[in-house]
Amino acid sequence: MIISASTDYRAAAKAKLPPFLFHYIDGGSYDERTLKRNTDDLGDVALRQRVLRDMTDLSLETEIFGEKLAMPIALAPVGLTGMYARRGEVQAAKAAEKKGIPFTMSTVSVCPIEEVAPAIERPMWFQLYVLKDRGFMKNVLERAKAAGVTTLVFTVDMPVPGARYRDMHSGMSGPNAAMRRVFQAMRHPSWALDVGLLGKPHDLGNISTYRGEPTKLEDYIGWLGANFDPSISWKDLEWIRDFWDGPMVIKGILDEEDAKDAVRFGADGIVVSNHGGRQLDGVLSTAKALPSIADAVKGDLKIFVDSGIRTGLDVVRMLALGADCTLLGRSFVYALAAQGGAGVENLLDLYDKEMRVAMTLTGAKTIADLSRDSLVKIP
């Protein structure tokens, strides 16, 4: 398969992966309306073309929390990344480091913190869920500190799991799921060898280290379901703010009032996110939610955004709408599944090229030059 654009990796991943894994990363909740709107609404944002400007010194570099980024992108936390390529978290982290951007590790990664952190020199970021098991939360935060993690990304939009109907049909869950996954793996021998056999252990590494015993993937849904905490409030986050020395980012903000609460709480950043359309279907796309949030809190903290970003042009659109930096989730996992770490590197090269074209033709020589003036209209 020819990869000529960043969006080509989705088809490549679909061809290589067993359906239960492809649809797990590709799908959304309920009728997947928000999932679709994320990409559609962002694609409708019209860039303002400007010409006859000297763009010879164009730069994509930016700085977040004192950390230099080669471009305003970080790899987002994605659960089970290690099921998409052999020791996938390690491969993705190395690719991000090589391209000069941060890698964010998920709480529910296959590889544990202690495996990924030593594989790279650049400090990684770490994502944590709000869980009933506060002992686990404290344990994993202590381990993240010891591993040199700089930035904590705290996910707050999963007090309960979203209803992802596609998973029931694909074999990720539902009747006879384990048997269905085995049959699917047999029909995808490349994945079965590279990940199914050579990528073991298939553990939830961070959880297994805490529990002192292997955590099979079959335990994934059950453990998370039992530990989501719908009682969580801003007050419950205070001990984490006190415990964590570095920057703390609140992920899952879609409303300007919640963004203002994050400022009052003392967060260093927020992620404008609807969890990639995987939680509450029917909410705003991030492209629609971002402008009013940026109007409310821009300059008070760093604004990240995810959900629906598939190209370098999309990154430029999000920055023009008010974001300081973007997070890539599905996009990098598609590339990882298709071509491993080399695929992620190539994907980021494609994003780089796409951003440079968009910025050249909008007259933005630096990331700071991107603003609402770079758009024809705000959707």
UniProtKB/Swiss-Prot annotation:
State the Gene3D superfamilies in the record: Aldolase class I (3.20.20.70)
The record lists substrate as bound by 24, 129, 164, 278
Needs which cofactor?
FMN
- What does the UniProt function comment say about this protein? Catalyzes the conversion of L-lactate to pyruvate. Is coupled to the respiratory chain.
The entry assigns this protein to a family as follows: Belongs to the FMN-dependent alpha-hydroxy acid dehydrogenase family.
EC number in record: 1.1.-.-
Can you name this protein? Answer: L-lactate dehydrogenase
Protein source organism: Vibrio parahaemolyticus serotype O3:K6 (strain RIMD 2210633)
Enzyme class per UniProt: oxidoreductase
**Gene it is expressed from:** lldD
Q: Which GO terms describe its biological process?
A: aerobic respiration; lactate metabolic process
The keyword Oxidoreductase is assigned to this record = yes
Q: Which reaction does this enzyme catalyse, per its entry?
A: (S)-lactate + A = pyruvate + AH2
What sequence ranges are listed for the domain FMN hydroxy acid dehydrogenase? 1-379
